[in-house]
Amino acid sequence: MNPMQADAKQLLQEFKQLLQENEITEEKCNIGLAPVTLALTSTQAELANAARSVFTVAQDVSRFGNMGAYTGEVSAELLKDSQIEYVLIGHSERREYFAESAAILNAKAQNALNAGLKVIYCVGESLEQRESGQAEVVVLQQICDLASVVTAEQWPHIVIAYEPIWAIGTGKTASPEDAQTMHAKIREGLTQITSHGANMAILYGGSVKAENAVELAACPDINGAL
């Protein structure tokens, strides 16, 4: 729920300057920004004159479709009409603090995909689940939950993001080896579900910083960072 508008504008100017100075071209990587809802359209407008294309990502979308009367909600259709390209679904904070179940996330994914949005779908396991040996089962089940509402034609419009929840704020660290092991399992699961699985992007949503970014990027099944 931050930063404030003035701070966000300053950060955006600094971001655009970095793009220009470092010549980070589209051939090198895709880049997206996920500002708070109130800053979505202003961010998109500001990025229109950036040195390269940067897509705008909504942090959430309503589980209710058809532009109904749901006070406070932001529909997939409204995001699409505002020319937003991607939306985050299933982020660990939404799962934890808002108790978003598989049914709720499925509804959000369906609405987003049917409206023509692309989905960044987050999966991950807790510390308790990992220590009990259930990590792979939990993560693959989350992907299977998504698969139950996705058509064959929609898979190319989905990006998977793995969040090692057990390593966020617990004092434990997910090594590049840990991340690659889970990403490989996710890749294996995706290839069993869809013919697009081998080519789908799988992002790492752990603590990515300058000190470990290169090592993480070198892992064969890690295609970027969240």
Swiss-Prot record:
Location(s) in or outside the cell: Cytoplasm
EC number of the protein: 5.3.1.1
Transmembrane feature ranges: none
Residues reported in the UniProt entry to bind substrate: 169, 207
Classification via Gene3D superfamilies: Aldolase class I
Catalytic center residues: 91 (electrophile), 163 (proton acceptor)
GO BP: any one term: glycolytic process
GO CC annotation: cytosol
GO molecular function, a single term: triose-phosphate isomerase activity
Pathway: Carbohydrate biosynthesis; gluconeogenesis; Carbohydrate degradation; glycolysis; D-glyceraldehyde 3-phosphate from glycerone phosphate: step 1/1
InterPro entries the record matches: Aldolase_TIM (IPR013785), TIM_sf (IPR035990), TrioseP_Isoase_bac/euk (IPR022896), Triosephosphate_isomerase (IPR000652), Triosephosphate_isomerase_AS (IPR020861)
Top EC group: isomerase
Database matches in SUPFAM superfamilies: Triosephosphate isomerase (TIM)
Keywords: Cytoplasm, Gluconeogenesis, Glycolysis, Isomerase
Catalytic activity reported: D-glyceraldehyde 3-phosphate = dihydroxyacetone phosphate
Main location: cytoplasm
Domain of life (superkingdom): Bacteria
PANTHER family for this protein: TRIOSEPHOSPHATE ISOMERASE
Assembly: Homodimer.
NCBIfam families from the UniProt entry: tim
Its biological purpose: Involved in the gluconeogenesis. Catalyzes stereospecifically the conversion of dihydroxyacetone phosphate (DHAP) to D-glyceraldehyde-3-phosphate (G3P).
HAMAP family (UniProt xref): TIM_B (MF_00147_B)
The family this protein is said to belong to: Belongs to the triosephosphate isomerase family.
Name of the protein: Triosephosphate isomerase
Species whose genome carries this gene: Rhizobium etli (strain ATCC 51251 / DSM 11541 / JCM 21823 / NBRC 15573 / CFN 42)
